[in-house]
């Protein structure tokens, strides 16, 4: 399991319940996402609660004997008898589930899903990281009998659940729906709470470290371990080290405030055209979130996507913070305390942009941004994110402070006025609506 010590409630559980009741064994469930986000844990917890029995086959540490069973599945009766004997678990028809954990490590097990699902005796749940699932599935017949579900780091609501707080998010939801400010005292506490989420992040290991130690250095070490694991995985994407270089440069790239990721700054003499396949693989791995420039933003943002212009974010903002201080042997508690108390240095203001990207992706939105050149052409106005909103679009400008200037938003709205549903400025002050603009505190982004 990815997180042995503790189980955290996750929203994906309800998605899994829906799959079980609606598909009734007609498909396997494939939970895909980055490493260390809790895929194995949720699969096992679901199996334990929702089935009479289950077998967990962890292909990262399975014996050659078990792995070899899937090289020849011509006799399913024999396969099931062997699995029951090896794991000492009795399987019950339509009441048991078999979990293929880290299924990418045994491609023939994934290929077998077609026949196992057709057999219909048991349910099947697969977990895998996209880095490996893509790279290791090229020589097999990928089954169509899969229901794929993306899993992300713990979102803010899941983080609050882990801390034993089930009341904050309903309050925020009601306030947002009623367009109500919460008042200075409440707002200050909510901002401090959200900054804590930004610092710890949503990786279960980091959250567990925070809960059990209340020590940011322990949290930071947990995050450094995850980053090291990701960087090792990036070698599977590109053994020249370019993926690792692109990832490590994310904080520096965002701090430059350039209109796109400057590949040549991260990798000397490299060009976007030569690196896009690596960027795509990184995006597919779900270790990063990538926002693409929309050249003519309108309904159907993907139709105007310019892949030569992109920005890259870490999939988890807690990892972003650790990545920003990676040169330090360990990020000291005092640094975290300063960040928690809103003493961000200027170049770390982009942690807010990263967390907005993370929140938008977790709510199922693809990431797009837009730039408009100044009249003199040397500078540009930038809308950080553009999201679909019913039959129109809504621009989002992000401020890492309470600063309410919104020239970019004004320029965008003037140019595309007939396409716009709502105008959002996300910042660090209380909610307000003024002159057609919604000023949304960062902790309410999930409701957009």
Task: Mark where each language-model region is.
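Short glycine-rich substrate-engagement loop in P-loop NTPases that contacts/grips substrate
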Residues: 61-94
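Structural recognition of the conserved hydrophobic beta-strand(s) that form the central parallel beta-sheet
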Residues: 99, 123-129, 150
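Short regulatory helix/loop adjacent to the ATP-binding pocket of P-loop NTPases
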Residues: 115, 132-148, 160-165
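Interdomain hinge/linker elements that couple catalytic modules in large macromolecular machines
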Residues: 164-352
